[in-house]
Amino acid sequence: MLQYDPNRYPKCTVPAAEIARVKGLGFLRDKRTADCFNCRVVTGNGKLSAEKLHAIADAAKQFASGEVALTSRMNVEVQGIPFENIEAFTAFLAEYGLEPGGTGPRVRPVVSCKGTACVFGLIDTYGLSEKIHYLYYKGYHNVKLPHKFKIAVGGCPNNCVKPDLNDIGIIGQWVPVANAEKCVGCGACVKTCPVDACHVEEGKYVRTTKDCNSCGRCVRACHVGALAYEHGYRVTLGGRWGKKVARGIALSHLFTSEEEVLALVEKAILLFRDQGVAGERFADTLARIGIENAEQILLSDELLNRKEEILAKAL
């Protein structure tokens, strides 16, 4: 059995008020030192240019310990920045269009998979996540929420970026649409389906809707053009990971345009600010008000019409 040693790490020499202030800027205390901090450098959606990567490396060498780590939300953490270097470090990053962030009860940095480039990707994940970053991470940066609010964009139902473990998750969809006249009953669709959601019956393609995750593989496998698809976005709400775990609940509505999805993201943020209680996660808010009720509100324009009122109210 081990005994806790309160003196295991150096005592911090930075005042508590300053620790709290810089934490709000994206600098977290490094417990290994008396006065150093680790900074989360926001990537936007997990993608960086070579120039920006070089800039982060240069900043790590010039103002910090030279150590760089990657966060679970695809940001870059520069470690071991002395307190007195924080201002200069931030100014250096700004020259390259980079900034610290990713802390506090607000919209957190957006996570995206590589769906734009991936062979399984069904939507432009880079493009959509970048729009969400500018509209809602940056656009809502000064809006205080009841708790952190995480957003993830996944290109397909493989869910590599785990969208349904975020407060709002977006998943690319290809919903198969069959043309029975063209179907020759070859079974190529059946062989490629990873979830056994289709079969050939009386020589024709049949899809089991409740099992299909709309990954689009059957559409690609059909060599006679008997399968077209409806392009869309599945949205999940209320996912979370950590001490308490919850998978996001998929809305019944399939969204068919980026504009619809972007509007829904804003509505979800406004719903959380309007009906959330300080200290509770979005999953708790949804459990309290009911997911069916939440979906009804989100599919209307009520929240957008009340946007100024909601943003002005005190939490």
Locate each region found by the language model.
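Flexible, glycine/charged-enriched surface loops at secondary-structure junctions
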Residues: S65-S72, T103-P105, N142-K148, V200-E201, ...
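A glycine-rich phosphate-binding loop feature that marks nucleotide/adenosyl-phosphate handling sites
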Residues: K150-P157, A283-A294
